[in-house]
């Protein structure tokens, strides 16, 4: 809303909106379908399909659990006891959101939180561990393949000509809202070894498709711009 001085032709406008000025409605396990036989009350809920969440419910932040299957590639579900999903593959989840996005090209930017999952897989005769670097690269590859580059907000976009990502955000700010409409930002929802592998393979996040998530400052100075603070009492001041 413009602020104008009474009796003057001068009108001072508020600073233009940037990405970080938004508050978004989000869903956790955004793909989830209640199992027929639920082992716990925590699984007893069903989300609308992703496109319906965006169009009818105003959701702009989505969270996807991504598993790697040796036969079927990247799958999306909660766990082996809670596997109901509205979009069984990472590709189908991206396609559902992209369809809505392209039909509503002026929408506020959406955030897609991607949580890679790994576990010991029991084979017929051997036990193998899914290689973390492999699933991370496959996720990157499918984002590249199934979400247009010109509709993706990447670390390179935010960094611009600055020396690092944190410096760019502190000095220049997040991208303007008008530059982000119709686009998506992908966030790597991982800590520990998974996040470290992702960042070690992509020094300075150059060429990365996802923004890593942090829970505190000082872990990767220069690249920390997305934080998850989930305790309003403990984290209130931050």
Q: Which residue ranges define each predicted feature?
A:
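Metal-dependent phosphodiesterase/phospholipase catalytic core, i.e.
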Residues: 48-51, 56-61, 66-189
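Structured loop/turn residues at beta-strand edges in well-structured enzyme cores
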Residues: 6, 17, 57
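Boundary/entry segment of secreted carbohydrate-active catalytic domains
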Residues: 13-43
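C-terminal active-site rim and adjoining tail of enzyme catalytic domains
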Residues: 185-238
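Conserved phosphate-coordination/catalytic loops
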Residues: 41-44, 87-91, 233
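Short, acidic/polar
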Residues: 44-54, 232-238
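Short, solvent-exposed loop/turn elements at domain surfaces
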Residues: 30-35, 71, 194-197
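Single conserved hydrophobic/aromatic residue that forms the stacking wall/gate
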Residues: 1-12
């Amino acid at each position: 809303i413009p602020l104008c001085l009474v009796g003057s032709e001068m009108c001072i406008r508020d600073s233009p909106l940037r990405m970080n000025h938004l508050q978004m409605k989000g869903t956790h396990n955004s793909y989830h379908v209640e199992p027929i036989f639920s082992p716990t009350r925590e699984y007893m809920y069903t989300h609308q399909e992703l496109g319906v969440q965006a169009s009818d419910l105003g959701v702009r932040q989505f969270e996807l659990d991504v598993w790697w299957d040796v036969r079927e590639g990247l799958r999306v579900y909660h766990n082996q006891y809670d596997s109901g999903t509205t979009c069984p593959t990472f590709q189908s989840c991206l396609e559902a959101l992209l369809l809505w996005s392209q039909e509503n090209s002026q929408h506020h930017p959406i955030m897609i939180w991607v949580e890679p999952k790994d576990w010991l897989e029991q084979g017929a005769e051997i036990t193998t561990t899914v290689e973390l670097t492999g699933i991370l690269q496959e996720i990157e590859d499918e984002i590249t393949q199934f979400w247009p580059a010109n509709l993706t907000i990447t670390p390179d976009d935010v960094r611009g000509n600055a020396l690092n990502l944190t410096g760019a955000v502190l000095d220049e700010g997040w991208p303007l809202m008008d530059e982000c409409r119709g686009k998506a930002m992908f966030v790597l929802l991982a800590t520990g070894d998974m996040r470290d592998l992702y960042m070690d393979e992509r020094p300075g996040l150059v060429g990365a498709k996802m923004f890593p998530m942090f829970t505190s400052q000082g872990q990767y100075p220069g690249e920390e711009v997305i934080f998850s603070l989930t305790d309003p009492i403990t984290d209130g001041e931050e």
